[in-house]
């Protein structure tokens, strides 16, 4: 596992006290430790932002699934209501047809009874009337049957159209979900790549600093081996080297802080751009 920034800083072999004889000698532990702590805090802040951004994406996905389920349920309820209405209409028409048939049969029976009581010379006329009424009933029966078949055909066509629309809606929802998951996976992959690049840059800088410290340590040991120099020259050289090292450490500290600020700003800008892009996609 990759060590934390604090662990990496704590494990670096710095000298506890300034040693003479080198332009890089001094006590940079405090400055570099503080710089690493600031960098670690900023990286933790960036990681927290990425975590919040991922949680927002998951919450939005869950809300969209719930909305899709609610729409599907509403459509199912509408189809059920329509089927109930169609069944009620068919039942009502069947009862109406039965009542009409009973009514006309009673009328025919009444006419037949009244015809039997009439005079013999009116029997032919009554028979003609009854035959005409029978033909009318047959025609009406045929019309009702044709209308019933037409109604059934219309209902089947409407039900088929509704099923096709439901299938189209489900296919569109699946396609949208797949495209959204692809986009989210690409975004997460890009974020992981950027974080890896930042970590790689930090590791490279760590190796450079350790090499410089090794060089500084060797130079200090060489100076310790030449103690035959005069005290005055030695003191002057040590003071000059300490001042130079302090200036170099201060410049390096400022450069590291500036680089860390640029890295954090770039990551923040990239995060905002991703959020704006996702917001535009969702609104569209």
Swiss-Prot record:
GO terms for molecular function: structural constituent of cytoskeleton. The keyword Cytoplasm applies. The keyword Coiled coil applies. Consists of at least four isoforms including two phosphorylated. One of its GO terms (cellular component) is microtubule. Residues 56-102, 239-268 form a coiled coil. Residues 39-284 are annotated as: Rod. Residues 17-30 have a biased composition (Low complexity). Residues 1-30 are annotated as: Disordered. Its main location: cytoplasm. It is found in: Cytoplasm, Cytoskeleton. InterPro entries: SF_assemblin/giardin_b (IPR008374). Keywords: Coiled coil, Cytoplasm, Cytoskeleton, Microtubule, Phosphoprotein. Residues 1-38 are annotated as: Nonhelical region. Consists of a small non-helical N-terminal domain and a rod domain with a 29 residue repeat pattern based on four heptads followed by a skip residue. This alpha-helical protein is characterized by the ability to form a special segmented coiled coil and to assemble into striated fibers of 2 nm protofilaments. Belongs to the SF-assemblin family. Major component of the striated microtubule-associated fibers (SMAFs; system-I-fibers). This is SF-assemblin.
């Amino acid at each position: 596992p990759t060590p934390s920034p604090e662990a990496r800083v704590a494990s670096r072999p710095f000298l506890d006290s300034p040693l003479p004889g080198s332009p890089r000698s001094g006590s940079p532990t405090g400055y570099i430790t503080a710089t690493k702590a600031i960098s670690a805090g900023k990286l933790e802040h960036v990681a927290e932002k990425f975590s919040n951004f991922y949680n927002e994406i998951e919450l939005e996905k869950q809300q969209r699934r719930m909305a899709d389920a609610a729409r599907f349920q509403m459509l199912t309820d509408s189809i059920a209501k329509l089927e109930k209405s169609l069944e009620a209409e068919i039942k009502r028409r069947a009862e109406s047809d039965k009542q009409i048939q009973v009514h006309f049969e009673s009328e025919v029976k009444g006419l037949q009874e009244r015809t039997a009581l009439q005079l013999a010379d009116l029997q032919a006329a009554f028979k003609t009337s009854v035959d005409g009424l029978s033909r009318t009933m047959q025609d009406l029966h045929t019309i009702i049957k044709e209308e019933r078949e037409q109604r059934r055909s219309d209902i089947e066509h409407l039900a088929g159209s509704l099923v096709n629309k439901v299938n189209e809606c489900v296919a569109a929802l699946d396609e949208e979900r797949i495209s959204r998951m692809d986009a989210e996976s690409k975004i997460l992959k890009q974020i992981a790549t950027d974080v890896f690049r930042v970590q790689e840059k930090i590791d490279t800088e760590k190796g450079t600093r350790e090499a410089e410290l090794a060089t500084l340590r060797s130079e200090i040991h060489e100076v310790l081996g030449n103690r035959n120099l005069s005290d005055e020259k030695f003191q002057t050289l040590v003071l000059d080297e300490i001042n130079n090292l302090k200036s170099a450490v201060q410049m390096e500290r400022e450069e590291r802080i500036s680089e860390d600020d640029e890295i954090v700003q770039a990551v923040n800008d990239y995060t905002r751009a991703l959020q704006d892009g996702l917001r535009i996609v969702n609104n569209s």
